[in-house]
A protein has these predicted regions:
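Basic, flexible Lys/Arg- and Gly-enriched helix-loop patches that mediate nucleic-acid binding at interfaces
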Residues: 17, 21, 25-267
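N-terminal acidic, proline/glycine-rich, low-complexity intrinsically disordered segments
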Residues: 1-14
Length: 267
């Protein structure tokens, strides 16, 4: 499925209004995938809302388990029946991963009141997804959206060493010395914090760089370039693992089975 970024009136519904259907009889709605999860995790797993929002619903006494209120850390048991605002918790949506060719100007925060937030796109999709990682507002390229927490951990955890390839335009010709510095790893300081980039693959042609990272430090490439006297003009992510970005700017669609294999081949 492919979708366009066009917010609709229906996106103004609350999460509970949008996701919870008619009242259901008091029967088990906690499949094996929910058993052992904390209550707020189980609600988030259903796709109804985020963990933080689920904890808020619980604290506002809008959640019942088997007809009784429970704390957010309550562990789901086989046979539990969960209700939110008197309605049955919806079944968890199938685990999916989508590709989004993020344009410059879209912020990866999920603030629903920010017109430039990716939240405006997420509200138009047929299921609840969240960004796997982020790209700066001034950057573009391949961004993954998913509802699969296990996949998110595999792709985002620092120990997993996932490759991410970027095409970077800088403000001047790149010297051999600068190229070697970037490849070997550079350091930069923000306030009292000192950061260090790991050795990485870097290629240069005139003022264009190709950089392959396995780290995910905040605004890492911009700080790396600044550390060697270069200013980033454009930054575009073209690959995650073996998954290459070939779609037009703004395209948002679910990955094919073959693309999932490319994405997870090294995870």
């Amino acid at each position: 499925m492919t979708t366009a970024f066009s917010p609709s009136a229906s996106s103004t519904k609350t999460l509970v209004e949008a996701a919870v259907g008619e009242e259901a009889p008091l029967i088990n709605n906690s499949p094996a995938t929910l058993v052992g999860l904390r209550l707020n995790q189980a609600i988030a797993h259903s796709g109804l809302c985020s963990r933080k929002a689920a904890a808020r619903l619980i604290s506002e006494q809008r959640v019942l388990v088997n007809g009784q209120q429970q704390p957010h850390h309550y562990l789901i048991k086989t046979g539990d029946f969960i209700q939110v605002d008197g309605k049955a918790l919806p079944e968890a949506a199938p685990r999916q991963c989508w590709l989004y060719h993020k344009p410059v100007g879209i912020d990866c925060n999920v603030k629903s009141d920010d017109p430039n937030s990716i939240a405006q796109l997420l509200a138009t999709l047929p299921l609840r997804l969240f960004p796997l990682g982020r790209l700066d507002k001034d950057s573009s390229g391949l961004l993954l959206l998913s509802n699969d927490g296990a996949l998110a951990h595999r792709l985002m955890h620092a120990d997993q060493l996932q490759q991410k390839e970027y095409r970077v335009e800088v403000d001047k010709l790149v010297t051999e010395a600068q190229l070697q510095q970037l490849a070997a790893g550079v350091s930069w300081q923000l306030g009292t914090m000192l950061y260090q980039s790991d050795p990485c693959l870097v290629q240069a042609e005139n003022n264009l760089l190709t950089i392959v990272l396995t780290q995910g430090l905040n605004r890492q490439i911009r700080y790396m370039c600044r550390a060697v006297g270069l200013k980033v003009l454009t930054l575009h992510r073209v690959r995650i693992n073996q998954l290459q970005l070939t779609d037009d700017v703004g395209c948002c669609r679910s990955l094919t089975a073959d693309e999932m294999l490319l994405l997870t081949s090294h995870s």
